[in-house]
């Protein structure tokens, strides 16, 4: 009774609101229960949708699509893309000038390494000749391993700033990224950066651009992104040279999913480009790829962080998330087209993106087997943000359950490993990178093998296999002419075949070599930098599959194979690696009561061997020095005992031994 009276007091003391005020939801409370699974979600949606229109939104809504400009910055690694992005954001008032450093490099690993890994986007408003322009900037990665990020970014853009370092000139990835942009039909604006450096040679860089790309460099802009010199000249050039996107707000919604990432509160957030129509919170959309339907919880722009808006229109790039969110991260398919429910027949889906192929594979295992599920969740969340990674579950007798991961290159793999450790606190064991091989059977069937576990044994190779092929790449190397001899020597030592050699200035060389991908992932870039004192740059593209003498090298401990360590490789690498393996593994295996034999073998042929000596009990301690027959008898007995122990004893190898052995 006392509880009922207390409840009545609370209810009577509650503020009284009119019933009418509850019906002012933007899309009608009668239908709200269809959109959201619970009352908390309904309340969240009303709060999102009923935000007052801001001054920023009023300015954006007044800009017609003819005054939109979508552009990106194309350059080699470390030529100043992210720094230039900062200056442009400051110039347009998007961020405050001063202490900003690589605002669009949002990952810890990007700030640590000083490279861009993920293409990041930002919307800016720029006033030119008294009129507002809506500029959409994409800061793209420069490294070859993130080519898929670059090509996806170009789908959102109408033009690009082709940025070249005044002191280094045109580099390998400048060439590669130029051809990607050129193939997409982007309008290119030449920009020379770092003109304030004492070693800067702007005219040489301009001549290289003119000779290599056949670009008109008369209107090239000379800037210093670090000091801000001449950066203000870039934006009028962007407005004048880059075309506006094509789109119609009155047509049915046609929206391309460009990227996605995971937020612990909002779930899957999607970066989208609107080609036609417009999108508001509360509307229902459908995916062409999966057929699944979603209610939009929030729409907005990156300014430079997520900034909610009431609507995003044709020509804009923005973010959305659904409420309720996507049930599985795999539902967000990059390159998918969305439209409003009911408009499916009126809308033609967009072509989407070419799926990048993983070319470098590693196995990943949790240090503690109990953390397998945590590792699986962490990998799935990162794959949501990077769809070029392939994931397959794998099991090892030595290391337990794990994953076989495929990457675009070794830097891609290294960055993913760093992100797993930093963003998710995952403790993992990673095996050395390997490349896929193609097995052609005698009956004509072809099979791509990415894991040593699936590689055929010796008998199958002899009797059932016609040929084994390995992937080759066409590598483009640029470097000063004085290192030509050393670079050719390095390429030849790595089974390379020279294709072209040309000088694009009196002192700079472009050398093209066809190289096995397996040699490229074996620290080829590090060796190249060492041979040229850091002056060389490298880019590569897929070439073809070529036949090779491919074998599987295994590590045996007391004749038992250690599956986690096996590698597929060319026979020319076997001797060197086999000796390295047995020497290194011996250092991490504890002594036992019996002899431990460590061998590296190809099939039945042992290539290298090391032995871990056993502990030895002094059985002669109590004997008199002259008792020779007794001495012999005790030693024979000890020898027999060891033989029996070796026959039945299993070598116990600690987890930390594998961790130390596989560590770089």
From Swiss-Prot:
tr-type G domain: from which residue to which, for each copy? Answer: 66-246
Which EC number(s) does the record attach to this protein?
3.6.5.-
Residues of the transit peptide: 1-43
The UniProt entry, under InterPro entries, shows: EF-4, EFG_III/V, EFG_V-like, G_TR_CS, LepA_C_sf, LepA_CTD, LepA_IV, P-loop_NTPase
Quote the subcellular location field of this record.
Mitochondrion inner membrane
Q: State where GTP binds.
A: 75-82, 139-143, 193-196
Q: Which domain of life is it from?
A: Eukaryota
Which reactions are catalysed by this chain?
Answer: GTP + H2O = GDP + phosphate + H(+)
Q: Does the keyword Hydrolase apply?
A: yes
Q: What is this protein called?
A: Translation factor guf1, mitochondrial
Q: What does the record give as the organism's lineage?
A: Eukaryota, Fungi, Dikarya, Ascomycota, Pezizomycotina
